[in-house]
Curated annotation (Swiss-Prot):
Biological process (GO), any one: translation
Functional description taken from the UniProt entry: One of the primary rRNA binding proteins, it binds directly to 16S rRNA central domain where it helps coordinate assembly of the platform of the 30S subunit.
Organism: Zymomonas mobilis subsp. mobilis (strain ATCC 31821 / ZM4 / CP4)
Entry keyword annotation includes Ribonucleoprotein: yes
Protein name, UniProt field: Small ribosomal subunit protein uS8
Name of the gene encoding the protein in the UniProt record: rpsH
Domain of life according to the entry: Bacteria
């Protein structure tokens, strides 16, 4: 069965894995998911990820991160959804928790955090917010 929102599925797997105190979670692989995981790893919200083969499908094993027993991610939410896309210019990109969190943005220059998008002066689709 095809997923209507693969990115939403990835975020839910990460959120559920952290609530269950898992060390890692597995998700089907896609280019968008890999790029979002790159941003999360670069910003320090996950330890990293590895690409693996499960049967005849590509998968991603995501290593979750904890700090003093608490999940590194307190809030992980999809902003732009398949039924309602949200776009923002570089100057209007939302700040999460007054800059303590990040917004993940899909831009013409790739998937970036809000700070990287502002530095490169590009806007795009606001995919998710994390803190």
């Amino acid at each position: 069965m095809a997923l209507s929102d693969p990115l939403g599925d990835l975020l839910t797997r990460i959120r559920n894995g952290q609530h269950a105190r898992k060390d890692s979670v597995v998700s089907p692989a896609s280019k968008l998911r890999v790029r979002v995981l790159d941003v999360l790893a670069r910003e320090g919200y996950i330890r990293g990820y590895t690409e693996a083969k499960l049967g005849n499908h590509d998968a991603l094993r995501i290593e979750l991160k904890y700090f003093e027993g608490q999940p590194a991610i307190h809030h992980l939410a999809r902003v732009s959804k398949p039924g309602r896309r949200i776009y923002s210019g570089s100057r209007e990109l939302p700040r999460v928790r007054n800059g303590l969190g990040i917004t993940i943005v899909s831009t013409p220059k790739g998937v970036l955090s809000d700070a990287e998008a502002r530095d490169q002066n590009v806007g795009g689709e606001v995919l998710a917010e994390v803190f």
